[in-house]
């Protein structure tokens, strides 16, 4: 619901959060179940302490990588398992750009290759200027579909003279497409199937921009002109249980999600 998304975005200012000291991490027991439970607790703590990876140091990124790789996936063939179906909220993204939860940016990465990092940094700067930023990032996964919903806070101020933002509004960028099962742990999305919709949650802030509300851009058609429309982006699921999902993009980027109810 829009009101819920507002609260999530507003509760996520762009500032560092103290990271738990090494000695405060949970120590696992000798049983596999105990180890995985403790590992998941440590993943949650590190994800929160680095604001979804946005403020993580190289040491923290390496620790998260080690924690993720130490988990034993309890779900065989997670790409076709019913547990995958549902709504998932991003907790951590290993490159520091939470908006990469959206398959639109998977496609950008595939198209731009080594130049993609420059694009990600530019987009991050653009969304964070004047106190804006990316709020909650959700993935809604259904049978043969995946929808990404990222809340964005946009602000406008006068930084040369230190004014607070003149206004701040919230909206969502929703990208959806069709999926197919590549193998037991991987799903693919054809670039041509992608579409992106802009939703302006705070329509009263900038009434002049209300015409953008609900606008859908057929990004798949644009990408189809740039590259082979049959090309697809892929997401591999390396861990899945009732509450936690860990996925990996084609460039090795790790994404950690928790299940949420809407």
Where are these regions (language model features)?
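Soluble ligand-binding/transfer domains with enclosed cavities or grooves
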Residues: 19-262
């Amino acid at each position: 619901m829009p009101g819920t998304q507002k609260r999530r975005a507003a509760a996520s200012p762009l500032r560092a959060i103290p990271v738990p000291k090494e000695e405060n991490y949970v120590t696992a027991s000798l049983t596999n179940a105990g180890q995985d439970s403790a590992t998941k607790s440590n993943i949650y703590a590190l994800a929160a302490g680095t604001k979804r990876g946005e403020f993580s140091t190289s040491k923290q990124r390496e620790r998260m990588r080690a924690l993720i790789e130490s988990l034993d996936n309890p779900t065989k063939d997670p790409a076709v398992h019913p547990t995958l179906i549902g709504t998932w909220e991003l907790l951590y993204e290993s490159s520091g750009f939470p908006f990469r939860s959206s398959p639109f940016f998977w496609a950008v990465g595939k198209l731009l290759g080594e130049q993609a990092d420059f694009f990600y940094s530019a987009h991050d700067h653009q969304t964070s200027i004047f106190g804006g930023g990316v709020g909650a990032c959700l993935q809604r996964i259904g049978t043969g579909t995946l929808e990404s919903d990222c809340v964005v806070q946009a602000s406008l101020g006068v930084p040369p003279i230190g004014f607070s933002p003149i206004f701040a509004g919230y909206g969502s960028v929703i990208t959806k497409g069709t999926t197919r099962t590549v193998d037991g742990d991987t799903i693919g999305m054809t670039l041509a199937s992608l579409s992106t919709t802009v939703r302006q949650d705070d329509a009263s802030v900038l009434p002049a921009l209300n015409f953008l509300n609900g606008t859908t851009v057929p990004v798949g058609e644009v990408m189809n002109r740039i590259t082979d429309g049959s090309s697809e982006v892929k997401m591999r699921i390396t861990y899945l249980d009732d509450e936690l999902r860990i996925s990996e993009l084609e460039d090795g980027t790790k994404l950690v999600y928790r299940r949420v109810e809407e």
